[in-house]
């Protein structure tokens, strides 16, 4: 492909230098030495300041031509001696170029890289003393091929050029072309190698040379005519193959004809157009002073350039940089010189507009740069003056004074003070513009942002704390008692201490919000951060200072924000912390933070100085404590935050949820009323979860729909609108003030069980229990989940009728997404059931030959744990005896292999579930009596609780 390098005449400034230097010489010398002076115009590009050779013409030895020594002139060109350009040479090689045409009288550098056939043709032409070619512009600028396959790919009018310089590097052939005249392509012809003939020394050309006659033009290559047999036989096999597939072979040789311009009319219009062109060129030069002198010399009347309209048009086409290819080609194609002058005038005027715009832009940019530079110099001078007068200090002194001012209010320990002083000394010797200066300054700011020795006064009044806790949350007896105990201990110690508590329970019961109330009750600063999904240890312990953008961990950020050493820090979702990975184990990093024996000297990676966190009250929240790592769980004081009963939810709705929503929606009790029966229906059939978050969302939906109804009842002309108050000052902005309230009184909306479905949709839970009457083999158990308690039915049936005559033993199958522990409970329950049945009814061989299937409904929910042991035994015995158990009964408890009933957890949640499904009698392990006694009285009412220590006691209640 052709590579238009730095010598390409279209390239900005270098290209203009060659053109103008060439045409300045053209105006003053004879036409016989035109080729030599054209080569001289390339002196700035191919001459250089290095080693040069000097070539002389045969007539004038005082006119040296400087040529770069690195350029290897083709040997057969005869050392740059002048060659008479033939007036008519129809068959020439074709060179297809991109973007800009090459106009007569100008020079262009072209590289041939890919096409070997074209390179071979050019070398052959040079060896035949025919350094000529035709240059045509490709219509598609994106076409990077060096040859064309069709003449339709190029514009028909081009230039006849002479190859004045050659540098053959083997793979690349560099050509310097000088255009002489316009030509038009007619048709492609085949490239046929002419046979070489030896020219005798006494031939006509040699005699003419000795006689001093001008050399005759070399013979033209043969045309594409049918060759004779000897010539055809001389064709190589490779050329025959190329002729077989002409579509793949590019066109390298064409037949052309000279383009003769029409006579130039000598009238005033032509002269005026030329003068306008010359004046516009002078205007363009004003915006680019680099070539102003050369252009002015070239356009001087003594040079006769302005008297040659053809040359003037070509000069314009070479000078313009913003013109499109089709516009330049239009000038190349035009034979009417008058029209060509008009095209040239239009192009140079467009170039003038673009040049003026570029000049204005550059001028504006230069002005802005100068203004900025001037302001910078003035500011620097002002800084120096202020520094000399003592008005302003340098950056280092300002930073150090700021740090010293901070430290006056801090009780910095000795080890931290030593580090601060070392960093201050280091800062004084650093360059303010260095990266180390920024790192040191940032480190000092963080060191002095830690509230060393600062504590906030803590509330020690129990009455104030109790009032603050009761106002924010209903119930939560265990949490409130523990906080009161904490205040009492600090009161007796007369000091501020820390503790690590963990609130665990189902979602929506107020674990996170109670922490804010505790902070208000204790008068401590509050800071919260969540560790759910955290996988990077640096979030807790900070980054090393060697990293770009390093920062301390969450605890140091907390200390900087709260500005006290005794805040309340809530670590939310501690059971969902990420596991060990590429960035460490965050759960293990919390061990040092939450260990009372270690957090007095907590070491952050960024500060690298021990910080005392022993006065911080840490409160963690979790849904499932089983997911908290054991060592971390061991460092916390676990407090169970159980779910709410229906009565508690109603009280929370009246005391907290509804008043808050009235304030947010501006709906008073006169506009919207929710009956207690509607709340109970809402809790029973829509919001059965342990928390109140879903209940809050449903009540919000009721308030929104009520607000919409009230807004629709209000007439549009009575809707409140904002009035605009304009002050006497006309320049003041208008201020919007609310107008008088409307006189419209909306109809009161009352929410009851009858219209509740209209506001919140259909009930989610339509029945309290799966079975109203349980058949044999079906027992209702009680289960604990992270969402609270729930009823868990155990269904046991026969897979097929019992065949007492079969030799095969019975089998048991379990379904319902059971875990390994629960599957073991099934096998244990089967063994216990066989023992009880053999003792109570020795003749009953039900379990020996039966194929039993045990299923636990809601198979999509994973189920595991040992607390369903007594329920499984009861279900198996009910099926074996074919006797249903007592209705409205529920049970829970782990069974041992000998029939002993072991204690289980989640008694509060299970009692709540039993009350929700309407159970009247509940069987609990005897060892869980203490857990039941801790429940409030209203929760224990209306339930018949039976405590059993062995399954025999339960058997008597169920089947006897």
Swiss-Prot record:
E.C. numbers: 3.4.21.53
Record's compositionally biased regions (Pro residues): 214-224
Keywords: ATP-binding, DNA-binding, Hydrolase, Mitochondrion, Nucleotide-binding, Protease, Serine protease, Transit peptide
One of the GO biological process terms: mitochondrion organization
Record localization: Mitochondrion matrix
Positions annotated to bind ATP: 505-512
Catalytic activity: Hydrolysis of proteins in presence of ATP
Function: ATP-dependent serine protease that mediates the selective degradation of misfolded, unassembled or oxidatively damaged polypeptides as well as certain short-lived regulatory proteins in the mitochondrial matrix. May also have a chaperone function in the assembly of inner membrane protein complexes. Participates in the regulation of mitochondrial gene expression and in the maintenance of the integrity of the mitochondrial genome. Binds to mitochondrial DNA in a site-specific manner.
Protein name per UniProt: Lon protease homolog, mitochondrial
Organism: Caenorhabditis briggsae
Gene name of this polypeptide: lonp-1
